Amino acid sequence: MTFYLSGFRSFLKLWKSNPYFELGPATSSASFFLGVHCVIGNQQRWFSVKPTTPPNSKILNLLVTKARTLKKGNDSNKQASSGPHYFAAGEAKKRSHLSGNPQNQGHTLPVKSTVQLPTKPLNSEEWDKLKEDFKGKASFEDFVISQMTRSCSSVDVAKSLLAWVAAKNNGIVGYNLLVKYLYLCVFHKQTSEVIDVYEIMKAKYKSLESGGYTLLIRGLIHSDRWREALLLLEDIKKVMVPSKKNYGDCIQGALLHQDVNVAWSLYQELVGHNLIPLLETLKAFFDHGKDMNDDQYSNQLLDILLYLRNNQLYPGESFAHSIKTWFESIPGRQWKGQFTTIQKSGQCSSCGRAIESIHLSPEEYEFLKETIMRDVIDGGDQYKKTTPQELKRFERFVKSCPPFDIVIDGLNVAKMFPKGRESQNLLGIVSQLAQQNLQLLVLGRKHMLRPSSQWRKDEMEQVRKQAHCFFADNISEDDPFLLYATLNSGSHCKFITKDLLRDHKACLPDARAQRLFFKWQQGHQLAITKGFLKSKLTFQHILSYDTVVQTTGDTWHIPYDEDLVPRSSCEVPTKWLCLQRKTPAPC
């Protein structure tokens, strides 16, 4: 795609002008919203979570009442947790490294450029010489501008490239060159240059692709023409739902220019499309609200905190600081925040209050059980992992047994300790648990019953004497059986597997079911401590509290992600922000 500039204004005149070159705080290119070598296509989401209706005072009061019933009088117990739990942030990565299978082993080496990118603007002769030395098969201009975007080169250097291209092609510049130049202008916060490119595109095109819209929106929000970003958002709406980045940029532009009504209206549109807002968007609302004496705005910020709770979202460290700063700036309320941890007992190390229990209420348990049976076992993709006949056979087997205390993923557990024989590993675990008079269920595959170097017949016979056993076909997977047996045995039943059950959580239909599943999983999945074969069998401690935003009215407890501590989607933060109010809220 190309365009001619002669009908708009002289391209050479435009690019000879001295740029307004003010380097703002550099945004990491790795975290920037648009990949430098690609444009945004169809909107993609890992999962769709229907946002809860914005909470009102009644919902907040119910939450406060629930939290107050959990308060304990034992304020003297200040002993910290002696070790991380299985779902603590960063533990999955540690386990991966310990098992000799680290994630992301190595990194792809950067592609060697066949030309040395200039560090200062070049004239026509210098660009001619550089092109003569170019040995690549791709277009020289496309290759160089792509390398510039990857390196976040100076706007001046990129401008000299486009001026050279225009001079060689009678004022014609390819659309891709212009968009990548626009990327550099946005990255370096060159607002005047963004506006120049915007005027060119507006004159030549009735509509753009989504990547161009995204760049223009982010570039315009910092200028006095920020409302034109809202017009671009409307153009996107004509063909697709704007991305959460598009909405987030427009919200930040509205807040930057003091139009809070537009910002909140866009926020409601965003969640109304079942999009989860970027955390930086939510942070912008708290940053804007500092020292603001506006009850309506304050209530909307509290709604955001409850939105985090209902969707099990965790602010980053910077966002947590913004929340703390906002609370402490509320006039006349005297909120005080402290960054802290939660003890193994479930009490806050700062204020001593009890955090909500990890255990599901009877109503929550029945809801989750019915949902799992309907959407994961009966109506899910389990027949890709087993057969209807085998599932029926297992259901009859479970009904014939007493409720289990622990359900064991036999094959998974047997492979936890590579140095030991697999049947020996399994027998060691079963024997120690059987000594506690527990009702055990071992789930396995039929090949485990065939004698081999890894599966000794005498050891498997000992396993079958000490535990109920069910051996599925070799093509089957254990997870549906594990979930069925554990949930049917009651809330006391625990299970042992290294599998984090991400796929089954993803099968659940809504945010509530997914949150309850993860809460149940944290309270029921046992993780074996390494090296048990030479000592007594021990497990990592199970959390007694729920890692979720919560309030008692005069306190808030907000788990947050630490900087530089990686956390997978199946883990929870270990750091908390504790907020206490010294002055009661007005009636």
Swiss-Prot record:
Gene Ontology terms: biological process: mitochondrial tRNA 5'-end processing; tRNA 5'-leader removal
Domain statement: Displays a distorted and non-productive active site that probably switches to a fully productive state only upon association with TRMT10C/MRPP1, HSD17B10/MRPP2 and pre-tRNA substrate.
Subunit comment: Catalytic component of mitochondrial ribonuclease P, a complex composed of TRMT10C/MRPP1, HSD17B10/MRPP2 and PRORP/MRPP3.
Residue span(s) of domain PRORP: 342-578
Alphabetical keyword list: Hydrolase, Magnesium, Manganese, Metal-binding, Mitochondrion, Nuclease, Transit peptide, tRNA processing, Zinc
Catalytic activity: Endonucleolytic cleavage of RNA, removing 5'-extranucleotides from tRNA precursor
Name recorded for this polypeptide: Mitochondrial ribonuclease P catalytic subunit
Positions with a binding annotation for Mg(2+) 1: D409, D478
Naturally occurring in which organism (per UniProt): Rattus norvegicus (Rat)
Source taxonomy: Eukaryota, Metazoa, Chordata, Craniata, Vertebrata
One cellular component (GO) term of this entry: mitochondrial ribonuclease P complex
Purpose: Catalytic ribonuclease component of mitochondrial ribonuclease P, a complex composed of TRMT10C/MRPP1, HSD17B10/MRPP2 and PRORP/MRPP3, which cleaves tRNA molecules in their 5'-ends. The presence of TRMT10C/MRPP1, HSD17B10/MRPP2 is required to catalyze tRNA molecules in their 5'-ends.
Protein localization: Mitochondrion
